[in-house]
Design a protein with these regions (language model features):
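Interaction/scaffold regions that mediate signaling and macromolecular assembly across diverse proteins
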Residues: 2-255
Length: 255
């Protein structure tokens, strides 16, 4: 990797390399046994370490979201190596609430990135306030743009996780939309009579990010291309229930 690239670019390249070498084609199933070997994560660990002196506020306005997504996803990949096959990723001590990453001299937990920065310091599911207190200097790193589709870009290394992606310089909106559509294609189910729509659990956790249940339904239906399915739902004249899938935290380890 060229040393002329900035730390954000090197992080992207290292994360993309790990995905290509140690994940299946879907980007969801990882070989965490191989990733425990130092030689297989040397580039990624070095790219993450280099962020300690990097200020992402120097990036163009459209790039900080991609930077924080890559930082989050890289941190999860490295942390998930501590999880044994068949065990829940959520059982890793302090996975989400302990600082695991240093950027511009500040320590960040995964919750700080997801909820503090990418969601505008909104509360995590089950909490009453955002993770970063008022006046916290880390709030200065909040991206100036907001996009609720970041929910589909965050990797959690488990069976219910979205795919691992490295977000690059291409238009971020296109990359986020691809992540959403991949999720809808894989996880959304519609009843034969259109009476219910099954959606990922994240919609139950963060309905306000999508405008409540009516907004969730609109968000999902806008990404279903099957006219017959849409006609079944339209025939219900709004009498459609949302069902939320269970979330499986088990490590998605390659066999």
């Amino acid at each position: 990797m060229s040393q002329t690239k900035n730390p954000a670019e090197r992080l992207h390249d290292a994360l993309q390399r790990v995905r290509e070498l140690h994940f299946d084609a879907s980007g969801r199933v990882g070989d965490y046994v191989a990733l425990r070997r130092v030689e297989n994560v040397r580039h990624l660990e070095a790219a993450v370490a280099a962020l300690a002196d990097f200020d992402p506020r120097s990036l163009p306005i459209s790039e900080p979201i991609a930077f924080w997504l890559n930082a989050y996803n890289a941190t999860v990949v490295l942390a998930a190596r501590a999880c044994a096959r068949g065990e829940p990723v959520s059982g890793i001590p302090g996975l989400f609430d302990r600082p695991r990453l240093t950027v511009a001299g500040h320590g960040f937990a995964l919750d700080d990135i997801e909820h503090g920065l990418l969601r505008g310091n909104a509360p995590k599911y089950g909490r009453w306030s955002g993770p970063l207190p008022r006046g916290d200097p880390r709030l200065d790193y909040t991206p100036r743009l907001y996009d609720e589709r970041v929910h589909f870009a965050l990797f959690s290394a488990c069976r219910s996780s979205h795919a691992l992606r490295a977000f690059g310089p291409d238009p971020l909106g296109d990359q986020l939309e691809a992540a959403v559509r991949d999720c809808v294609r894989r996880e959304v189910r519609v009843a034969e009579d259109g009476a219910w729509v099954e959606v990922p659990r994240l919609f139950k956790w963060y309905p306000g990010d999508f405008g409540g249940e009516p907004g969730i339904l609109d968000f999902v239906l806008a990404r279903i291309d099957d006219d017959a399915v849409l006609d079944r739902i339209d025939a219900r004249q709004g009498n459609v229930k949302l069902h939320y899938k269970a979330f499986d935290w088990t490590l998605d380890q390659r066999e």
